[in-house]
Amino acid sequence: MPSLSLMAAGNDPSGLAVAPGAVWVTDEFAGTVSRIDPGTAAVAETIHVGDRAAGVAVVRGAVWVVVHPLSGHRGGTLRIVAAIPRLDSIDPGRAHMPFPPQLLGMTNDGLVTLRHTGGSEGTQLVPDLAVSLPSPTYQGRSYRFQLRRGIRYSTGEPVRPGDFRRAIQRDFTVGSAGALFFSDIVGAAGCTRHPRRCDLSKGIAVDDAAGTVTFRLRQPDPEFLYKLTLTFAFAVPAGTPDHDVGRRPVPATGPYLIYRYEPGHELVLRRNPRFHEWSRAAQPGGNPDQIVWRFGVHPDAAVAAIERGSADWGLFAFPFSPPGDRLEEIRTQYAGQVHVNPLPETEFFALHNRVPPFDDVRVRQALNEAIDRNVLVSLYGGPGLARPACQVLPPGLPGYQPYCPYTLDPRPDGAYTTPRLALARRLVSASHTAGMRVRVLTDPGFAPATYIVSVLRALGYRASLWTASGGRFRALSSNSRYQVQISRGGWAAAYPAPSDFIDPLLSCGAFRPASDANGNAAQFCDHRIDQDIQRAWRLQSSDPQAAGRAWASVDRLIAGQAPWLPTVNLSAVDFLSKRTGGYQFHPQWGILLDQLWVTHYRAGAASPASP
């Protein structure tokens, strides 16, 4: 008898029943029941049942299918108001801040993803466009994926194995920040040196006939599957340009497509007619028929729009938030509509370790001792949005253990109390650097930077602000050629792992001299700490608990060397309208917009009224 594979009947078989001359298999998310000929192992017939086919049984020759009804919350328009002036990009290879997972995670897909649900389960890896999660082979240096069958882009073009190699090659070609995540793929070093000639055919082998993608790495990477969840690894079809797509989105695979994008004004998502739900864990069908996102709305106007019901959701996080006292009023008055959640993010100033006076560890430690982090909490929006930070890792990440050596009477619980200005002045005196000119690089209007200037002056430096914005700011802060002394920074975890904070930002390998692509703005390199980083890496796949302890140790060692001036860890405030339900907060992506539902909608409703 031929070998029988349930996958022949669909991507997500949910039930099986055997009858004389037939095997019946249901596929829940395709809404089908299929009859397989056991003699040939071929699908002889497929019947669409209209709802989710959860199981099947054969009773006295009759085939019975158990169905779950489709969501009763589907329909309507979800209206979003955002204070951010614009997205940096809608290109999966270029989008980085501020909302790429929330937005592009609804429109596009990779081989794997995080479970699409709120709470701690949201950190679990699940297959997306791949059939299953592969186990690494060849001592952890190879991963082979089998693609799901029958998935198409919104254009009707099928998703092919080569689309995943194209996506990652394109990261190098377009100068994506995501290229750093894939530097261990065989051939990536050549792509870094010559991006326009990037060829990863040796590192990413594709077989269109078999529907497989095989990654070959130079060395084991226990976080490689996490890296494949990022937008930088989302499939892109042939013909995708080797530059930012601008206003023309990459064709969609997810439940929504970008219907219209007007930078700085509006983005509209509508249902992707080619989408079918292949895995509820990875990419469930959304509830709203349409999602309209308006940009550049003042926080006070956004609050007013939600209050009167002309908008459904606003995210308030530094720097796009009402004043702290107004935020507290909202939390009190609309307690049932407001959700506050910590973000996996650390705000900091990078102290450029190879540029005087911050080439002296005593000066770096002095500034960490001198700042009042309670003042900084108020400047970042108050205790509803910020908490003092003295270390690199934010709360919630594996390996995080509260630690604050830069406070009066350091405590085992890591709590911050007050600064030690007298100690800071003694450290500066010992360094013989008082009186030097120091310029603090920041974007315009950033109040915490003004405060840092005042502290530097109190320590005896001739300090001033240096403002730049956009690409100019990024180049100045990253490229060591410009000899910047201190620059504003901030980092949110791309995936739930401590190495995503430490390795790309503070390892020796992350420092690229005289390069705009340098991720280590502090220019920090401590070879002893680097050895500990490598040890923590090696432990991750074999002993996660020991790895967590190792990362906590690395975090403390880095704090002692003070390459950064950590300031706060941020929280986000989600404010929802009364007609909105189904709130879920994903630990990595934030609010799951596609799982919200809106009540009192009119079928076929068009764009929302302006707030």
Language model segments and positions:
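Extracellular/periplasmic solute-recognition and catalytic clefts
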Residues: 259-270, 292-355, 378-379, 450
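Extracytoplasmic/peripheral linker and loop segments enriched in polar/acidic and small residues
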Residues: 206, 365, 377-380, 410-417, ...
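Structural transition elements
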Residues: 256, 384-427, 442, 447, ...
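Periplasmic-binding protein-like
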Residues: 354, 358-400, 558-563
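Ligand/substrate-recognition segments at binding pockets and active sites
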Residues: 80, 425-493, 572
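N-terminal lobe/hinge region of extracytoplasmic solute-binding protein
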Residues: 81-138, 169, 249-251
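Gly/Pro-rich hinge or "lid" segments in bacterial periplasmic/extracellular proteins
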Residues: 115-120, 220-290, 298-301, 421-422, ...
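Surface-exposed binding/hinge segments that line
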Residues: 146, 165, 173-238, 260-262
